[in-house]
Amino acid sequence: MADLANEEKPAIAPPVFVFQKDKGQKSPAEQKNLSDSGEEPRGEAEAPHHGTGHPESAGEHALEPPAPAGASASTPPPPAPEAQLPPFPRELAGRSAGGSSPEGGEDSDREDGNYCPPVKRERTSSLTQFPPSQSEERSSGFRLKPPTLIHGQAPSAGLPSQKPKEQQRSVLRPAVLQAPQPKALSQTVPSSGTNGVSLPADCTGAVPAASPDTAAWRSPSEAADEVCALEEKEPQKNESSNASEEEACEKKDPATQQAFVFGQNLRDRVKLINESVDEADMENAGHPSADTPTATNYFLQYISSSLENSTNSADASSNKFVFGQNMSERVLSPPKLNEVSSDANRENAAAESGSESSSQEATPEKESLAESAAAYTKATARKCLLEKVEVITGEEAESNVLQMQCKLFVFDKTSQSWVERGRGLLRLNDMASTDDGTLQSRLVMRTQGSLRLILNTKLWAQMQIDKASEKSIRITAMDTEDQGVKVFLISASSKDTGQLYAALHHRILALRSRVEQEQEAKMPAPEPGAAPSNEEDDSDDDDVLAPSGATAAGAGDEGDGQTTGST
């Protein structure tokens, strides 16, 4: 055991020193020479049995202090003792060079005594899990590419670990939401798509196969080249390359995918694609950017195309029709407006030239809605304009004495009630007669607003007038409708009623006195010889004349009583 422990130290120390060197130090030819040694298949075959059966060797391996880095850099270890190692130390050396467990970190190559290769278990789990298992997929992929644990093809113990320290720890991380980089790498493509759909075989053909048998077919020089290329890449680049390779595989053979992935193959499903969208897709595919993936983000393309279509349609619709514009070109009735204006011009010959000029100015080729409306109203408004006519009422030769607002009622004999004729202006006019210069008076009443004549009567001596109440006067007058005498009632304010009654009573008394004077003038003068003829005849004449005088006196008393009562 002492000899075995002495031989372990030079075999285990080189991986520790070489791990701190530059990662791409070994050349492909040197790796090929190391992998062609004869005892490595046997040591690799014995690895599963000796890993758990020698805990003391693992303890010695864990407690062994590392050598200083300066010594390892100055004096590299000779490869001769490695060829003479027994199977157990060579197994430890190959295991430390090939890779460590994901939980190890920097001390993973020291704790390889209890190591059991979980290669197939992690690879099968990556097939069933969804995108959160990208870290496990990457770790399993990197473990397969350097052929260290596959059927004796492991290089010598001096080969450094092909995985970065960040990838040796299998820590679950959230999905990266950054846009994938345009750089395409064909080395790392997981065996499952982004949505859990299995990718076709030709897409994953560029990547090393997941089974140990297919990995054994590859030469060690190719494996070394891939190790050097993979060690130079960063983990973020690997993630972006995974996404870009998936997109490239989807481009190559989209028809082979049996499951549905949302947002893919929109060109085959949607029939609303224009040539502009196709050209935009070709330009995007020819000039990929870092923000948008190449020809896969169809939604942004459709949004931009819909915005362009909306702007184009808005421009086209704005050029087509605007409400209220060019009415003279669309409407078939403008000639009617011209006819109306011509008719108005015929009626008003004086304003003919001005109206024609205004109509021509108001109807240009392209006029606005307000202008056309103003022209229409101006053309139709001429119909309502009436010529100024001198008003003749027939009262021009008369002088107005009294004017008042009142209501006029007429008495209906059949119904024995008062019927209203209307409400308006009552005027009392005086007119000098041409014969002897006597006054002739009349009452004229017209309705308010329409000025319809509802009362027109002259004053005569036998006209009856009395004051029915403080605010009403009852008179007899001629009716204009049936040309007969009817009883009318004038209702007004108390002041106007008193003034009207006094004026009417004064004029009627003057007419009566005039009639009496005419009667006295017509009576013949008595002869002087016939006067003392007979007393009986005189007494008889006195008896006949007395009733007439009494009646006349009674009538005079009634008139005086009415005048005093009215005043």
Curated annotation (Swiss-Prot):
Domain of life according to the entry: Eukaryota
GO cellular component terms attached to this protein's record: cytoplasm; nucleoplasm; nucleus
Expression by tissue: Widely expressed with high levels in testis and heart.
Modified residues (Phosphothreonine): T75, T124
InterPro entries reported in the protein's UniProt record: PH-like_dom_sf, Ran_bind_dom, RanBP1-like
GO MF entries: R-SMAD binding; small GTPase binding
Effect of S221A: Does not affect translocation into the nucleus
PTM info: Phosphorylation at Ser-126 promotes its import into the nucleus.
Compositional bias of kind Polar residues: 125-134, 184-197
Region entry Disordered, spans: 1-263, 332-373, 515-567
Feature: compositional bias, Acidic residues: 534-544
Role of this protein: Acts as a cofactor for XPO1/CRM1-mediated nuclear export, perhaps as export complex scaffolding protein. Bound to XPO1/CRM1, stabilizes the XPO1/CRM1-cargo interaction. In the absence of Ran-bound GTP prevents binding of XPO1/CRM1 to the nuclear pore complex. Binds to CHC1/RCC1 and increases the guanine nucleotide exchange activity of CHC1/RCC1. Recruits XPO1/CRM1 to CHC1/RCC1 in a Ran-dependent manner. Negative regulator of TGF-beta signaling through interaction with the R-SMAD proteins, SMAD2 and SMAD3, and mediating their nuclear export.
Name listed for the protein in its UniProt record: Ran-binding protein 3
Species whose genome carries this gene: Homo sapiens
